[in-house]
Amino acid sequence: MSLPEHSPLGKPSAYKTEYDASLLFPIPRQPKRTEIGLPEGKPVPFFGVDIWNAYELSWLNLKGKPQVALATFIIPSDTPNIVESKSFKLYLNSFNQTRIASPEALQQLLHHDLSEATGGTVQVRLVTEADLGKQQMGELDGLLLDRLDIEVDRYEPAPELLFADQDETPVEETLVSHLLKSNCLVTGQPDWGSVQIRYVGAPINQEALLKYLISFRNHNEFHEQCVERIFMDVMRQCKPVKLAVYARYTRRGGLDINPFRTNFNTAWPDNKRNARQ
């Protein structure tokens, strides 16, 4: 099993400039799911995607001229593995001096390698120079929790803070906070994010939810793992009928990671970059 501490994170790395798919370092999802009460071999109560955006992708055409593009990778949450982010960066950098016939050929190669590493089918989208001006930005929709004037003293995940008023009429609500911060599981470096919680069910106490989200501030876990922990904690403590959790993290090493988990059929998020990304 590939363990996070064996990944390139936190270690000096040689930057290869010739294509090398072996640089990708997969990490199994299951150990962290077991940690949040989801045993191996049983269905998980959510589905979704991890949306990765790469801003530093370059290669050479067959004449040796550099090419650049943005790339989006959509990794289903039911793949057995995630990819450690520094290894992803090193892998993408390995294309820098690699001659490739066309963007379509690169897209096919990326699809193959990421699908092999994650154990599933990864969608790859490239945005070449001609279409860069068409890229849109947008903020997460919803009622902003950060408006609340609260006192905070918990900085490790505290699901017991969460509660909903089960005696009230069910509501359909979308809540947003930009105060999510967690830390890399291996290096402890800060990860900054915005999070959107959509649900149908008994009204979730908003002050409690904001305190809970802030409680991740000193927690060490990868982005995908944090979102799944949030999903499970809200489900168990507040018991909504429908729940979707979406986080957009700021980029590091030319990559941003945006996990989405839901228990009901809905369109995947539109992947608009927010101002902090």
Swiss-Prot record:
This protein's record includes keyword Kinase: no
Sequence positions that bind NADPH: S85, K86, R252, G253
GO cellular component annotations of the record: cytoplasm
Enzyme Commission number, as recorded: 1.7.1.13
Domain of life where this protein originates: Bacteria
A Gene Ontology biological process term: queuosine biosynthetic process
Cellular localisation: Cytoplasm
Reaction(s) catalysed (UniProt annotation): 7-aminomethyl-7-carbaguanine + 2 NADP(+) = 7-cyano-7-deazaguanine + 2 NADPH + 3 H(+)
Top-level enzyme category: oxidoreductase
UniProt GO MF annotations: preQ1 synthase activity
Keyword Cytoplasm: yes
Active site: C184 (thioimide intermediate), D191 (proton donor)
Keyword field: Cytoplasm, NADP, Oxidoreductase, Queuosine biosynthesis
SUPFAM superfamilies in the cross-refs: Tetrahydrobiopterin biosynthesis enzymes-like
Residues binding substrate, per UniProt: V83, E84, S85, H223, E224
Annotated pathway: tRNA modification; tRNA-queuosine biosynthesis
Function text: Catalyzes the NADPH-dependent reduction of 7-cyano-7-deazaguanine (preQ0) to 7-aminomethyl-7-deazaguanine (preQ1).
Subunit structure: Homodimer.
Family to which the UniProt record says this protein belongs: Belongs to the GTP cyclohydrolase I family. QueF type 2 subfamily.
HAMAP family assigned to the protein according to its UniProt record, in alphabetical order: QueF_type2
PANTHER family referenced in this protein's UniProt entry, alphabetically: NADPH-DEPENDENT 7-CYANO-7-DEAZAGUANINE REDUCTASE
Protein name: NADPH-dependent 7-cyano-7-deazaguanine reductase
Organism from which the protein derives: Cupriavidus taiwanensis (strain DSM 17343 / BCRC 17206 / CCUG 44338 / CIP 107171 / LMG 19424 / R1)
